[in-house]
């Protein structure tokens, strides 16, 4: 693979609303940082492969090798100030929802688990890791990753297992997620830092999270 041009990618979004307080703890780089990294890489022949960085909505002509605009670097301080003054005050859509009851989730869980388990089988994935999702009334949804049936348990049941993933999020958002992707989606909620994870051991399992994205109607 010998491209004439390459473009680095970096997530340029910021957290708004209540979760904006987590922005400083989020692993992130600016597009400028990614471009500088590749521009200074000794493994790239910069005479043959040229890095390209563009403003939003600008155009790059592959024939001439030029953009229609001069790139303007991100002003990090201005970006932080705008997020603090404006974005942090935004409300999430789900914050206007009525707080759901335990019964609201009990109606959804069987079908959601069915989809989760189908994806787990498709991935040919089985694990001793137990997934616990926090529910109203101090209950937890226990989802085994090995094909066993799901259960509604109390929080103290977590202590019975050595390998687990505990998931906590706003019940209103959780109800939207489990109601289906047209309302909200696990992956988007995770990227936006709306979900808290507690793992034992502290190991990220891609297969668990892939299957988890199908825990919805």
Residue ranges of predicted features:
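Feature captures hydrophobic
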Residues: 60-217
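Binuclear metal-ion centers of metallo-dependent hydrolases, dominated by the metallo-beta-lactamase
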Residues: 1-82
């Amino acid at each position: 693979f010998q491209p004439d041009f390459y473009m680095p990618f970096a997530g340029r979004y910021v957290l708004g609303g209540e979760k904006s307080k987590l922005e400083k703890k989020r692993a992130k780089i600016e597009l400028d940082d990614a471009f500088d990294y590749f521009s200074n890489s000794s493994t790239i022949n910069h005479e043959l492969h040229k890095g390209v960085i563009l403003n939003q909505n600008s155009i790059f002509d592959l024939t001439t090798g030029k953009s229609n605009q001069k790139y303007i670097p991100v002003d990090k301080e201005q970006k932080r100030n705008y997020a603090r003054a404006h974005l942090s005050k935004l409300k999430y859509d789900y914050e206007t929802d009525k707080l759901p009851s335990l019964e609201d989730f009990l109606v959804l869980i069987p079908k959601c688990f069915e989809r989760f388990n189908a994806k787990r089988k498709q991935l040919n994935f089985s694990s001793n890791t137990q997934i616990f999702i926090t529910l109203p009334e101090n209950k937890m949804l226990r989802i085994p990753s090995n094909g066993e049936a799901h259960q509604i348990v109390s929080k103290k049941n977590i202590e019975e297992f050595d390998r687990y993933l505990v998931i906590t999020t706003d019940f209103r958002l959780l109800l939207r997620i489990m109601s289906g992707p047209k309302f909200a989606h696990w992956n988007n909620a995770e990227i936006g830092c709306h979900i808290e994870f507690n793992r034992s051991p502290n190991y990220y399992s891609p297969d668990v999270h892939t299957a988890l994205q199908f825990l919805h109607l």
